[in-house]
Amino acid sequence: QCDWSSDVCSSDLVALQQITSRDRNPLSPSVLSICAINGGFTTNVIPSEVKLMGTFRAMDETWRFAAHKRIQEVVDGIARSTGAEIDLKIDVGYPTVYNDPIVTEKARSIAVETFGIDKVEDGEIRMGAEDFGYYSQKIAGCFFRLGTGNKQKNIISGVHTPTFDIDEDAIEIGMRMMATLGATL
């Protein structure tokens, strides 16, 4: 809150983006996205308050918490330099999912043996939040994705969309994979 909240908001936005481009290890992916900016209702009145909302995700827990600290430092610095009152709330969120290399290779081998090499794809690193991260921080595990789409049945929408659907034939495949993993590991 201050007399020039829009300017402070802009300063925060630019400065926060420097964290993932300047402060991180370039070999450890992370993303900071400001996804909502709310403040003001007209063109000729400076809003008394502007609210920024976003998300920060990282592939390394040490960096994740160091970045949280850095975000606080950046925001505090802007508050001091502008005289603004800035209330920062960081929801820690889900921990990073860690795929244990041994368990992951075993799961991949089981999938290839059970369903065939043409049905197994090695996925790329993703920045999604997943509660499985709580498990993978405690015990060796492997997070894998079960393909549930089917172009022939026009089941093509991604998760978190209003038209999401699954090909129910995938349920049997998932059950077989989980049962084989459970019996093997």
Identify the role of each PLM range.
Residues 1-8:
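Single conserved hydrophobic/aromatic residue that forms the stacking wall/gate
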